[in-house]
């Protein structure tokens, strides 16, 4: 059971500690960006439109595949998107954001999702601007009962499927039947 957070998050900026923190609310990002940099609201709309398109493409063709059939990447939707995807795979997130926004606070907000990928905006491909679709357009959600409740729910599902869960033991091997590990 997910609950939308409002605000999704609150940002404190180094060097601006005497100013109130910035609340990032779903559906209000354009207004926030415009208040910090004239013209940034319109540019954010274009940025989020792109993020939404890339997110949809990734969700439909990359996120839920095991890549056993490379031909799946030759889907017409993916092929049509190649001219836009190429630069997003080759360019970095930081430069992608910097080309659109000047205010360092806006750059920090848009670069922050790289943290969830275990990297920095310098290393993350620009394609990962799709993450901004999730926090700025879809909204930040939190599982009722915390993330432990999510783990408990997943454990229940796999137990019902016949999986035996053992904790506090050392794993010495992974056995996979009828297919490679």
Predicted regions located by residue number:
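Helical element adjacent to the flavin cofactor pocket in flavoenzyme catalytic cores
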Residues: 98, 129-181
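Rossmann-like flavin
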Residues: 14-123
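N-terminal FAD cofactor-binding segment of flavoenzymes
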Residues: 1-8
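Residue-level detector of beta-strand face positions
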Residues: 10-12
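Residues at the C-termini of beta-strands that transition into short coil/loop
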Residues: 6, 23, 169
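Glycine-centered secondary-structure boundary/capping sites
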Residues: 1, 38-41, 139, 168
């Amino acid at each position: 059971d997910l609950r939308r957070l409002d605000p999704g998050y609150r940002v404190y900026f180094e060097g601006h500690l005497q100013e109130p923190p910035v609340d990032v609310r779903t559906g209000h990002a354009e207004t926030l960006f415009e208040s910090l940099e004239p013209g940034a609201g319109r540019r954010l709309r274009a940025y989020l439109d792109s993020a939404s398109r890339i997110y949809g493409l990734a969700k439909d063709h990359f996120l839920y595949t095991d890549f056993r059939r490379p031909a799946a990447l030759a889907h017409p939707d993916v092929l049509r998107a190649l001219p836009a995807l190429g630069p997003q795979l080759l360019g970095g997130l930081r430069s992608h954001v910097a080309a659109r926004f000047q205010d360092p606070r806006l750059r920090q907000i848009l670069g922050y999702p790289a943290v969830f990928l275990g990297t920095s905006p310098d290393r993350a491909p620009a394609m990962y601007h799709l993450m901004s679709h999730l926090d700025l357009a879809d909204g930040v959600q939190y599982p009722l009962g915390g993330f432990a409740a999510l783990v408990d729910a997943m454990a229940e599902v796999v137990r019902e499927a016949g999986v035996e869960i053992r904790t506090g033991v050392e794993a010495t091997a992974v056995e996979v039947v009828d297919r490679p590990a």
